[in-house]
Amino acid sequence: MNFTLARFVFQFAVSLDTASTRSNCKYLLLTSKKRKFTTAAIPLTHTSSEELLVVVGGGAAGVYGAIRAKTVAPKLNVVIIEKGKPLSKVKISGGGRCNVTNGHCADKMILAGHYPRGHKEFRGSFFSLHGPMDTMSWFSDHGVELKTEDDGRVFPVSDSSSSVIDCLLTEAKHRGVAPSVVLQTGKVVTTASSDNAGRKFLLKVEKRTMNLVECIEADYLLIASGSSQQGHRLAAQLGHSIVDPVPSLFTFKIADSQLTELSGVSFPKVVAKLKLENVQRSSPYLTQVGPMLVTHWGLSGPVILRLSAWGARYLFSSCYKGMLTVDFVPDLHIEDMQSILSQHKIRFAKQKVLNSCPPEFCLVKRFWKYILGREGLSGDTLWASVSNNSLISIARLLKHCTLEVAGKGQFKDEFVTAGGVPLSEISLNTMESKIHPRLFFAGEVLNVDGVTGGFNFQNAWSGGYIAGTSIGKLSNDATLKNRGF
């Protein structure tokens, strides 16, 4: 039988044409009652130009890495195997706008500090090899015009993730000489092993809609399957350990029905501190500053998401129970607040407290009513009737408002997980496994996760680029060696 690219059949059911070259290979069809297997017998005389890179996962890291490998080594055969739709997370990120990276972190030390898992390791060469500015230049050079918003988040000017997706898929299709990078969807790599010499990867690929298993022999393997169990399973089969994954970047469920009735109320800046029973010593990372939003189940917003990321494992082990202390007026000292309240009481003595909140506090009326209620004050109470002790209590409550965290947000809204292949088991300057040569990792399959703001995608771009570069160089070296250079 004739098969494309010497060792496998390519199918891509999204928007790309099938790219193929012909070469003769012997395949042995083995049938069983339940499944049909195809086993490839690879000719021993194949040349380095026939080397194959299989990328497991058609997300940001996988596609970017495949493109880079093909750029460095144009004759390298590259196939991406994705069980679903390629770049699906890119499509929905940033509310469909795609937060490509963060443009306010040119310094690698500052950038590394945005990764709860990875902040120590990323202080090295990782972002020096391919950082946010490199990512922005790459997309700009490939026709995606970008903009940087006030908080540093970088989006396509089109405000549509389709601009990023179209760019990546087009580049994957046209990159280098034939054959191009090929995407194979609707299939899952179920097992991975190596041959006796440890030079080849033997992969079994199952088609999701058919009882069919294909056997593929690859020279290089890049696992970039995100946080799915598939990637962790393959890594374990090839000798790697796995840090158990737990949710990161999620909202908090708050045990306060009066607060949740304020759904939609937002605060541009609060200081939130998370206290957990299983954390004996205070961690600076469990105190965060930023915007916060009240939801109908609790709290959300960047400050909460950052707390959930830094406290991901602590929260998991405590069954997502803890105490949250919020400073709603972080730019004012408590003594100044008490003085403001005392002066406000004198000035507006005959007004109802609900109708007259000190403007210095910048609080909406609905939340001001909530604060008064927690202090046992009726909104109809006149300012003249408010005791000095009550004024002190109001100031303290606004500076140290305690809220009980009762669990994660009720929806499966975590977008990122903590856990995966330990960074200690790979070389970050190449993304190659320290355990198995020619095995590479990139993206969320590793025990790396970032906070919101484009940092998780930057991890994907950087890891994919470094891995692709390393694979391409190895392939080129093999080509020169086979030619006698």
Where are these regions (language model features)?
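Conserved N-terminal/central alpha/beta ligand/cofactor-binding core
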Residues: 83, 88-178, 294
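A conserved short coil-to-beta-strand element within the FAD-binding core of flavoproteins
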Residues: 180-199
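Beta1/beta-strand and adjacent pyrophosphate-binding region of the FAD-binding site
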Residues: 44-61
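Residue-level recognition of phosphate/Mg2+-coordinating polar/acidic sites
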Residues: 106-109, 128, 133-152, 204-206, ...
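Glycine-rich FAD pyrophosphate-binding loop
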Residues: 54, 70-95
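Core beta-strand elements of the Rossmann-like FAD/NAD(P) dinucleotide-binding domain
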Residues: 49-51, 209-220, 287-288
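A conserved FAD-binding loop/helix module that cradles the flavin
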Residues: 220, 224-238, 447-479
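Short hydrophobic core segments
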Residues: 54-56, 214-227, 235-236, 292-295
